[in-house]
Amino acid sequence: YYTGARSQEALDLETEMLPVPDDDHAVGVLRQIRSKGKRRDLYAPMFLIRELYAFVYEPDAADKKRKYVFVAEKSNYAGRQLTYHAAYDMMRRTQECLGMEFHFHDLRHTFCTGLIEQGVDTAIVQQVMGHAHLYTTKRYVHLSDRDVMAHLTDYGEQWKGGVYHDIC
């Protein structure tokens, strides 16, 4: 969720892509991840990088030289890259436990929508999400009635106060 990564981008993360956790920065960059046949950078909060780093390099990790961050644990496939099917099955079981329906892409969508709602510039959101075109990013914009009313109230107050009076 915290990166807006596509499901396959997350599954393709290699351990060598993880930066060493750094206390001087709030955000880290995972360089040159595979994405839709291209390469892009993935931005992640430092707390997540610390968690991933600990997960991959924990002292009791069965396979300390694994190539991928997310690997299978079952004996026949232990240490191999986790497949989309296996990840999807884990997501399905999680849905059943929580009693709610959601999909991998919902996490990406929610992250992107949250950035937009917080007022992050759409050009930055575009880069963070790895969108080639701004119109793709704009598809994630879902304004609530509350958001629209708040902005129109501010706009109305400016008119009422005479800020735009000289224009007419």
Predicted regions and their residues:
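Short, cationic motifs built from Arg/Lys/His that form the positively charged side of catalytic pockets
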Residues: R6, R40, L52-A61, R108
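Conserved tyrosine-mediated DNA breakage-rejoining catalytic core shared by Y-recombinases
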Residues: T3, Q8, D12-E51
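Catalytic-site neighborhood detector that most strongly recognizes the C-terminal catalytic loop/helix
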Residues: M129, H133-D154
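Helix-turn-helix DNA-binding elements, focusing on the entry/boundary residues of the two helices
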Residues: S7, T122, L134
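C-terminal secondary-structure termini that scaffold catalytic or DNA-interacting sites
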Residues: G156-C168
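Active-site/catalytic core of tyrosine-dependent DNA strand-transfer enzymes
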Residues: M46-M100
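Short, basic (Lys/Arg/His-rich) helix/loop patches that form interaction surfaces
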Residues: Y88-Q127, H131
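The alpha-helix within a helix-turn-helix
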Residues: L11, Q126, K138
